[in-house]
Each structure stands twice: as structure tokens, then as C-alpha cells.
């Protein structure tokens, strides 16, 4: 079964958690550390969305983020959607097998 944790492990990305109760941040990707930090207080759906979105930033150049913010965020959102659809497809296919 595909999970955010398994995708991070396959890509060599460390996944850590932070206490996000006093911030509006849900997650962040740190390229130098190749690490995704996720708010530990997200529900399961938000957690999956955030991790998959942050994975979408892996190939982005942090020095270009201010200039290309909209493009980078849209690419990260597409990445999130890709993984969520893949999860649903895997789940659906496993239910079809008797």
C-alpha cells in the first residue's frame, strides 16, 4: 500500500513532525536537509495532502522561489493530486480483487 511515509522513504526524504498549534504552517520542505516537516496536529486527509504537496517541491530551486512562487505552488499541488489519485486507484484496484 502506498503511503506518504513510503513515498518519502523511496525518495530518501526524511519526514519529521512539529507542534503546529501556534502557527498557520502545515508543512515545509527543506531542500538542504532533504526533509519534510509536517504539523503533527493535522487530520489524516490534511496530512496526506501536505506531505504529497511538499514532495512536489523536491526539484524546485529555493533561490527562485520568490520569483516563481505561483508556478512552484501549482506544480506542488499537481504532485499532491497525482499521489492522491494514485492512492485511490490502488485502493480501488485492491477491492476489485476477490
Model regions: which residues?
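Active-site hotspot residues in diverse enzymes, especially metal/ion-binding acidic/histidine motifs
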Residues: 1-98
